[in-house]
A protein has these predicted regions:
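Active-site beta-alpha connecting loops in nucleotide-dependent enzymes
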Residues: 3-15, 20-33, 279-345
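Nucleotide phosphate-binding/pyrophosphate-handling subdomain across enzymes
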Residues: 224-324
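Flexible active-site lid/hinge loop adjacent to a nucleotide/diphosphate
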Residues: 128-207, 211-226
Length: 349
């Protein structure tokens, strides 16, 4: 079989180490070879008539010429579906990494492995492991059409990646698409507001309103869960996985989890001022969830970057209720300054 890989990042490099293939990437200017003897070619050199299977790097946009010319697209997940052990897929807008790490911790003693968008490509995961726990992006789900998990955990969805998907509706539909493929005997946990949009399905659906509702659904004692929002919801979903798959609630094991770097890391300086590093909060919803605990303080908020085409009006409507000053940076700085001015929010460009 003539296999073509699109892109040459972490995921495709791991795959190229396992299969004979030809790799196409925009950064290649001329043909060369990788360490395994695979051809490395410029994207323009791709000929669909000389390829039987095309596996795209998840981040390549659907409008890229390689995708438009491909005739046999297959996602990383679909390619490994025949050898994939029972799996938990974790998706949503925010909290995927933390929830995936927490869930893997709860199943680590039995040899469960974590991977996917969290950093370890499927090509590097042992297919003989009893369980894969995969952080799963909307990009991967967009290209996946056959693979399905034993348990799908969907965190809340808000406007994000519109520039990649073309619209929020397309982004949301990618997140929900896997449910249609899940067979009887599998389970999907999802936000209740998405229930009316779920496609025809055979799996069990468990819908939650918020953290309090999650705790009630699974009989979880939140007093034994040592995390505050937004990490509380992540922890409850990890415990829900343990409850569904093993009928257990390993509170003490969960309590040993340490929140990762750049996620609401707090430090006091010599003058007693609180600095919060929340640089993993890369979209509007994450910012909105981080601020309420500081409602009674004067906030200096550094904000900016690629907003991925999201509607930022709800963010600025909420920010207007805080005592704060914005410090705008990044590619959308002009847009942020205009919105701040419109909502009478002090800012420094």
């Amino acid at each position: 079989m003539r296999i073509s890989l699109f892109g040459y990042g972490t995921t495709m490099k791991a795959l190229a180490a396992r299969v004979a293939c030809t790799i196409y990437d925009d950064k290649f200017c001329e043909e060369s070879r990788d360490e395994y003897g695979n051809a490395l070619r410029p994207s323009a050199a791709f000929d669909p008539e000389n390829s039987d299977l095309e596996i795209p790097s998840p981040g390549i946009m659907p409008t890229h010429p390689l995708i438009l010319r491909a005739k046999h697209l297959c996602s990383e997940y679909d390619y490994f579906a025949p050898v994939m052990p029972p799996s938990v897929w974790i998706s949503g807008t925010n909290g995927k990494t933390t929830t995936t790490e927490m869930t893997q911790l709860l199943f680590a003693s039995e040899g469960a492995l974590a991977g996917g968008n969290i950093g370890t490509p499927l090509a590097k995961l042992d297919s003989k492991a009893p369980l894969w726990i995969l952080e799963t992006s909307s990009f991967t789900l967009h290209y996946t059409h056959t693979a399905a998990p034993q348990l799908y955990v969907l965190l809340p969805i808000v406007d994000d990646h519109a520039s990649w998907h073309g619209s929020f509706e397309s982004y949301r539909n990618s997140k929900l698409s896997v449910i249609a493929r899940m067979p009887s005997g599998t389970t999907a946990i999802l936000p209740a507001n998405l229930l009316p949009l779920v496609p025809k399905h055979c799996c069990e659906l468990i819908a939650y309103e918020n953290s309090a509702h999650l705790a009630k659904l699974f009989g979880i004692d939140t007093a034994r869960v040592p995390f505050a929002e937004p990490f509380l919801q992540d922890a409850l979903l990890a415990l829900a996985c343990a409850k569904i798959l093993r009928n257990a609630l390993p509170y003490e094991l969960l309590a040993s989890y340490h929140i990762g770097a750049h996620r609401q890391q707090k430090a006091l300086d010599a003058q007693g001022r609180l600095w919060v590093n929340d640089s993993k909060a890369t979209n509007m919803d994450a910012t909105l969830k981080a601020l309420p605990q500081y409602k009674d303080k004067k906030i200096h908020l550094i904000i900016g970057g690629d907003d991925k085409g999201a509607n930022l009006l709800p963010l600025f409507e909420a920010l207007a209720g805080y005592r704060l000053c914005l410090y705008t940076i990044g590619s959308n700085e002009e847009r942020l300054c205009a919105l701040a001015e419109k909502h009478a929010i002090p800012f420094v460009a």
